[in-house]
Amino acid sequence: MTKLQLKYRELKIISVIAASENISHAATVLGIAQANVSKYLADFESKVGLKVFDRTTRQLMLTPFGTALLPYINDMLDRNEQLNNFIADYKHEKRGRVTIYAPTGIITYLSKHVIDKIKDIGDITLSLKTCNLERNAFYEGVEFPDDCDVLISYAPPKDESLVASFITQYAVTAYASQRYLEKHPISRPDELEHHSCILIDSMMIDDANIWRFNVAGSKEVRDYRVKGNYVCDNTQSALELARNHLGIVFAPDKSVQSDLQDGTLVPCFQQPYEWWLDLVAIFRKREYQPWRVQYVLDEMLREIRHQLAQSQQLRPEQAAESED
C-alpha cells in the first residue's frame, strides 16, 4: 500500500475548518484565500479517497470519517508544535506560549505595571488568565492548572513538587465604609461575629469564613469565625460590595490604597490587627521548564521586585534575598 504524503498545511486547514464549521471563517483565521482553503481540502479528500466534511447543510459538518480522523490530526499538530517549541527552546529562541495565572487583582496589576516592561519577548505569546482561589485553598493549597506555566498566589501549592518563590508579604485586615461603621461600630476582631462580613469563597468552612489576625503588638495569631449575606470568589468584587456599605471586607492593604485616600473605605480597627500573607510565584522546577518560561518568569519577577523595592513595600534585606 502506498503511503500517503500528508502535508502540514492540509491538516491545519482541516483542524481550523472543523473548529469554525465555515470555510470563509477558516480562510480569515489562516490568512489565506478562501479558494485556496477549498482547494487544499479537496486535494486532501481526493488523496485519501474519503470525505472529511458533509457539504449538504448550510454549515460544514464532519462526516463519520472526519469525526474519527480529527483527534489524530489535532494530536499530530500538537506534536509538531511541541517539536518546534523544543527546537526553539534549545536554541534559546523567543517563541511559543507562556501562560500566567493569578487572582483578578494581581492580573490587573501585571497588566498595568509589569507586562509592558518586558520589552523583548520576540515571538512569545503571553497568555494572562484569571485564577481566583478555590474553596479551602488557603488551608489545603492551591491547584496548579494543567496549562499553567506560572501561578502567582497568596496560597502555597498543593503539589509539593512545585517551586514557590517568595515575592513579598501583604498585610490583610478588615475595612468598611464610613457609613457602615457609623451604623455598626466595631473596635476589635472578636466583635466581627456580630457584623455582616463579606465572605471570600476560598476561605469558606461550612457557611462561614475564618479570618486571622495578629494580636496587636505581638506575633500571636488568632482565628475568628465570621458570617454574612454575600460571598465572592475574588477580592475585587468583595471590595465593591464594601464600597456600597454592605459589610466588612477582609482585604490586602495594597488593594485599598485609593479607597483609603479618598475615604471610600476605612480600617475597622485603630490598633494594627492584621494577617500577613506571603505572595508567591509558583512554577515547575527549572530543569522541567522550557527556556521561554524561564525567560518570562525571570523578567517578570525582576520587574515586580524592582517596583516593590522602589516603593519600599519590600524591606531591603528581603529584596536582596529574593534576587539570590
Curated annotation (Swiss-Prot):
UniProt-recorded name of the protein: Uncharacterized HTH-type transcriptional regulator YiaU
GO cellular component: cytosol
Gene3D superfamilies linked: 3.40.190.290, Winged helix-like DNA-binding domain superfamily/Winged helix DNA-binding domain
Annotated region of DNA binding: 23-42
Boundaries of every HTH lysR-type domain copy: 6-63
Superkingdom of this protein's organism: Bacteria
GO molecular function, one term: sequence-specific DNA binding
GO biological process, alphabetically ordered: regulation of DNA-templated transcription
Coiled-coil region: none
Pfam families: HTH_1 (PF00126), LysR_substrate (PF03466)
Family according to the record: Belongs to the LysR transcriptional regulatory family.
Keywords for the protein's UniProt record, in alphabetical order: DNA-binding, Transcription, Transcription regulation
